[in-house]
Amino acid sequence: MALLIITTILWAFSFSFYGEYLAGHVDSYFAVLVRVGLAALVFLPFLRTRGNSLKTVGLYMLVGAMQLGVMYMLSFRAYLYLTVSELLLFTVLTPLYITLIYDIMSKRRLRWGYAFSALLAVIGAGIIRYDQVTDHFWTGLLLVQLSNITFAIGMVGYKRLMETRPMPQHNAFAWFYLGAFLVAVIAWFLLGNAQKMPQTTLQWGILVFLGVVASGIG
């Protein structure tokens, strides 16, 4: 329980730190690259290939690329359109997406009640901002929901892999973050803006915190 509380606090700070000091000032793709790159370095000593097939390693990397690489890219872009509090509010749909995607991947009967709940939540988001709804708002909302969905796909994929192709969790996380790092490198070279690099010690410090502490240790 203590570890869960500590992790929750670290993640709570990470949202505010990025929104206050990095969003709009530092290129979001570079921020993702540094965050997952540093986290990958934390887990690098646990990287093992022995006993794992190339397909298994590739699947763990693919899941990591989706859950962390693509998810961070989408959520970091969303900060340009939403406030930190709005972004946090709109992440409440993630458990619903996890349930729905798990049903689909498990070939179970889809629980439409959860799908309807997700739809109501989106409508509710519009009502909350009914007097200030703009194209920017809807763009941000869409980015957060896509981020939620990619995170949910990764969560379900990881659970399925641990059931069908198990490996020690610290080893799995090493491949996980390596996959996220590779997709972040590609995104940075294709879409990144080299003119918006960190300019202050504080910005670099926050990136180190996000990568080593929030993602690596947390």
Predicted regions and their residues:
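Membrane-interface helix termini and inter-helical loops of multi-pass transporters
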Residues: 16-28, 80, 126-139, 164, ...
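Transmembrane alpha-helices of multi-pass small-molecule transport proteins
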Residues: 24-70, 97-98, 150-157, 174-191
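C-terminal transmembrane-helix exit sites in multi-pass transporters
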Residues: 42-51, 75, 94-116
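Glycine-/small-residue-enriched transmembrane alpha-helix faces in small-molecule transporters
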Residues: 1-30, 133-160, 182-186
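Structural signature of hydrophobic alpha-helical transmembrane segments
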Residues: 20-38, 76-94, 139-150, 202-212
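Hydrophobic transmembrane alpha-helices of multi-pass small-molecule transport proteins
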Residues: 43, 110-130, 148, 184-185
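Hydrophobic/aromatic residues within transmembrane alpha-helices
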Residues: 21, 31, 78, 104-106, ...
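Specific transmembrane alpha-helical segments of multi-pass solute transporters/efflux pumps
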Residues: 10, 14-15, 44-91, 127, ...
